Amino acid sequence: METFSIKEHFDKITEKTNLIDKFVEEYLEVLNNKTNDYNFYKRHGKRFYKITQIVVGRDGKNTDQLSVHSFVDMNTGLVYKAAGWNAPAKGARFDLLDEASRKRCFANADSYGGYLYR
């Protein structure tokens, strides 16, 4: 049986967390580049990043119309459709740590969330 030190274990967790953070930033960039009608941001929760969208007005400034687009699990990188403001729907739609799933997510992503339906 292989043994790991606490530092090695912590380093692996940190590496995975940094990778998930990087992919979430790429996800936001993809969403923001696909529309001028919304601006997308992430909010930190206890377990999930909440991906929110704000409607952009005709003057190009953010309005006060805010909604949840999706959730990303901070520990696993799984992407979920929003069931409401505070909770994701059951069943992950994409896995940001899996290259094929991530590419499919980014290719199909849109501001309306249609790609998140099963």
Residue ranges and their predicted role:
Residues 78-107:
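A short, surface-exposed interaction/processing loop segment used at functional sites
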Residues 48, 60-63, 87, 94, ...:
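Polar low-complexity intrinsically disordered regions enriched in Ser/Thr and small residues
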Residues 2-35:
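Short, non-transmembrane alpha-helical segments in secretory-pathway proteins
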Residues 108-118:
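Cysteine/selenocysteine-centered motifs that mediate thiol-based redox chemistry or coordinate metal-sulfur cofactors
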Residues 36-70:
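Exposed beta-strand-loop-beta-strand "reactive/processing" segments of non-cytosolic proteins
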Residues 73-74:
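Short, acidic, Ser/Thr-enriched surface-loop or helix-capping motifs
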Residues 31-34, 100, 109:
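Low-complexity, intrinsically disordered/propeptide-like segments
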